[in-house]
Each structure stands twice: as C-alpha cells, then as structure tokens.
C-alpha cells in the first residue's frame, strides 16, 4: 500500500475535459487519496452531482481574468463558438498566481493538468510532481507531437500512417483552429512534466503509445477508459416504452443512431440523414438534438417523413439510455459520432458499428478502428464534409446484409476485440495500476 497523497487537478475548462478528470478524481478518492479540483465558478453546479466523494474531492473555484475575445460571463469552452476557443487558453494561462497561492497554502504532492504549459515549471519550484493527463486519444496526442500529421503528412517514424487527418479533415477538423502556437505550448507541457498519462489502453492504441513514449522520452502511464459504471450493470432496466417497441422487431434488425447532446446537425444534413435512414428499409431509432436553427427535431424532419416511417422508425429528441438499448437483442447496428463514451459502448456491444465522426479526435479514432483494426465502417463524405442519403444507406447496409464481405469481416474482428476488452479485470486493472504508479512516484519524492 503506497502513501496517501493530495492531488491538485487543473483541467482545460471544457466539460469534455473536466468530467473525465472528475471520473479520475473519484477513482483516486476511492483509493483513499484527496483531491483539490480547480474549476470555473459556473461549472460547480453541473459537476457537483458527479462528485461521488465530496469529503475527499474539494472543488476550488477560480476567477478567469478578462481577456480579448472572452465575452463577459464566459468561463468554459462551451460558452464560446467551436471556431475560437483561444480566449479560454489565454485566460487559464493567466491564473498562475491563483494556483501558486493554493500550492503554498495546501502543499499538494501532485498536480494534474492537460493544456497549461507552465504547470511543470511551477511544480518543480515547489518540489511536487506534475502529471500531464490527456483525455484525448493517443492518436490525437501523437498528432500534437508530430504536427505535420495534422496536415496529412505524418513523419517517417509515425507508427500508423492511416491514422491521420486527410483532405478537408485537416482544415475542417483541425484541433485548435490551426494554431501552431497552441500545439507548441501543449507539446512543452507534455515534454517537461514528470509523468505523461493518457485515457486509453494498449489493446486499442499500443503502437501510438510507443511513439509518444519515444517523443516525450519518459514512461507513459495509461488509465484505461475510466468510464463510470455502465447502466446495464447497475441494476437499471430499459424503459418499458423502448423495450416494448424494440420487441416488435427481429433480432439484430434495428439500427440505433445516437450523436450525444453536444452535437448539432446542419438542418439540410439532418434531413438528408433522415432520408438515408428511410432508404435503408430497416427499422431504426434515432436519438438526436434539434439541428442548428431549428427549435425542435420534429419541425426539422423532411416533409411527410414521420407518416412514411411511423411503423418502423422513431426520431427522438434528446438523450436515450444507450447501453441499455445496445444490449437489447433486436438492435444490430449502432450509428454514432465516435464520441468517447459512444465509442466504448460500441466496442463492448455485439452491434455492428458505423461512425460519422465530427471532431478531429473522433476522426482519428474512427480511422484507427475502421482502417487499422477493421472493427467498424464509416460513412463516406465529400470534401466539404457532406454525406448523401445514398452514402448513409450503402454504408449501413454494408454491415447489415448477411452476405456482405465487409460486414462479416468487421463482425469477426469486433467480436475478437470485444472478448479482449471485457475480459475480467482488464480495464479496471489499468486504473488500479495507474494509482499504484502514482503512489510510488509520491513515495520516491518524499524519500529522495
């Protein structure tokens, strides 16, 4: 048993980063460690319900200074449009005095961070360990370390040439609006910290992890996916209305589509998507947010669509219980955006997987799973990012048709990978070993 430690956490102020950091904080608290979690004031209310150990995890609100481009009252990445997140970076960069004051007062053993480059330098001044914890994929971290890969030109020693952005993706899906200055700052944090860690596992991204270790010249620690307990293992059951509806179809025949609560289609692409689902001729259930500029999903549906598909298709506005739906025997295919949670729910299900990625990290993971591991397929898109109803229909049918060669290939590969991922203790073992490694780091610091 290692020494109990006190950790600071200073994640990027986006909910897609703060929530995974809180999952890790819960794991540390479960093992008896204390966490001081830095966050903007307005995030406190949304994150509080996810804090499973409020006696051990203390939220410490920070006040962002005014900077150019940061609207009054904006404190998180979701307060700014996707095209311009830089003001949050600049504001977080200016919080060093507030963080240092807390370090002096509370004397932590470790500080976790992801994007703020000066944390390792500050930690060294105070004799504490800096842990760079990346919740983006190893593919994305590797691309940050080899920025030409972001432009579609990975270096010769890049381990997986297929896992890079191409064509329109290098512009449309660029990580931070093509800001090489930000790439440089993130790289500085990765190379100067004491410990590099990523929310992934060797079974998915082993080769890329090796590349990152080589580039950073230090051992890489992996936490595994660090997901909260799945609903289908927590005693919950699928709502009766969905269970009854799904029971009306043959096993493995229903196509389930979900894109999370943070993604919004353009209206014309949403209508094309719906028409593609109709063209398939298969039963389907779609969980989606209203497209941009539309007050409701129903208002945005193609004319006459609901009437034509009412016996075999539902478009539902908002969130559904994904893991419970995926475990229903009637569901045979999962179409999603390759968001982190949906990606993992795909991999541990028995469903065929179709991806329509939207962001850079999602595009890279889709390439890994589709072209390298061949456990999924993706919908083909034009240079603008547009996909047609025929593209969607053909992609889904390629994995749903019994005689499809590609469908049988990805099904075999997916089954094999799933058996590995769900083997007892594999994923939970990553988190346990990660915490043990941190305890050793802290012990070595105390007795050095």
From Swiss-Prot:
Does Glycosyltransferase show up as a keyword for this record? yes
Which EC class is this protein assigned? transferase
User: What Gene3D superfamilies does the annotation carry?
Assistant: Glycogen Phosphorylase B
UniProt-recorded name of the protein: UDP-glycosyltransferase 79B5
Give the organism's phylogenetic lineage: Eukaryota, Viridiplantae, Streptophyta, Embryophyta, Tracheophyta
| Cross-referenced Pfam families | UDPGT
Alphabetical keyword list: Glycosyltransferase, Transferase
Q: What is its EC number?
A: 2.4.1.-
Family as reported in the entry's similarity comment: Belongs to the UDP-glycosyltransferase family.
Q: Which residues bind UDP-alpha-D-glucose?
A: 261, 320-322, 337-345, 359-362
UniProt superkingdom: Eukaryota
Q: Name one GO molecular function term.
A: UDP-glucosyltransferase activity
Entry keyword Transferase: yes
């Amino acid at each position: 048993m290692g020494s109990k430690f006190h950790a600071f956490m200073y994640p990027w102020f986006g909910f897609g980063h703060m929530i995974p950091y809180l999952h890790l904080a819960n794991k540390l608290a479960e093992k008896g460690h204390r966490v001081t979690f830095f966050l903007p004031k307005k995030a406190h209310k949304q994150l509080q319900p996810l804090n499973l150990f409020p006696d051990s995890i203390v939220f410490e609100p920070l006040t962002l200074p005014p900077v150019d481009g940061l609207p009054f009252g904006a404190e998180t990445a979701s307060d700014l449009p996707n095209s311009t997140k830089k003001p949050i970076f600049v504001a977080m960069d200016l919080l060093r005095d507030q963080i240092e004051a807390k370090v002096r007062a509370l004397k932590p053993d470790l500080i976790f961070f992801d994007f703020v480059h000066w944390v390792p330098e500050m930690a060294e001044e105070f004799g504490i360990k800096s842990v760079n914890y990346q919740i983006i994929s190893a593919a994305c971290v590797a691309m940050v370390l080899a920025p030409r890969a972001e432009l579609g030109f990975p270096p010769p020693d890049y381990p997986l040439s297929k896992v890079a952005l191409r064509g329109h993706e290098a512009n449309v899906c660029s990580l931070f609006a093509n800001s090489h200055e930000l790439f440089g700052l993130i790289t500085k944090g990765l190379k100067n910290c004491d410990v590099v860690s990523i929310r992934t596992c060797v079974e998915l991204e082993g080769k890329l992890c090796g590349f990152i270790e080589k580039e950073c010249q230090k051992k890489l620690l992996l936490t595994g996916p660090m997901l909260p307990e799945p609903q289908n293992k927590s005693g919950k059951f699928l709502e009766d209305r969905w269970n009854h509806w799904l029971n009306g179809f043959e096993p493995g025949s229903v196509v389930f589509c979900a894109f999370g609560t943070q993604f919004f289609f353009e209206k014309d692409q949403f209508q094309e998507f719906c028409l593609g689902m109709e063209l398939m001729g298969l039963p389907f259930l779609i969980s989606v947010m209203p497209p941009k500029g539309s007050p409701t999903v129903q208002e945005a549906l193609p004319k006459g669509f609901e009437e034509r598909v009412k016996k075999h298709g539902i478009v539902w506005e908002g969130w559904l219980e994904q893991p419970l739906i995926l475990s229903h025997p009637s569901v045979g295919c999962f179409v999603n955006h390759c968001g982190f949670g949906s990606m993992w729910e795909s991999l541990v299900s028995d469903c065929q997987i179709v991806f329509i990625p939207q962001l850079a990290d999602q595009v890279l993971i889709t390439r890994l799973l589709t072209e390298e591991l061949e456990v999924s397929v993706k919908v083909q898109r034009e240079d603008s990012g547009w996909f047609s109803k025929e593209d969607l229909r053909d992609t889904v049918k390629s994995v749903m048709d019994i005689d499809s060669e590609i469908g049988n290939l990805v099904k075999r590969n997916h089954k094999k990978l799933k058996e590995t991922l769900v083997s007892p203790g594999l994923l939970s073992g990553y988190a346990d070993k990660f915490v043990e490694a941190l305890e050793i780091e802290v012990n070595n610091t105390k007795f050095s």
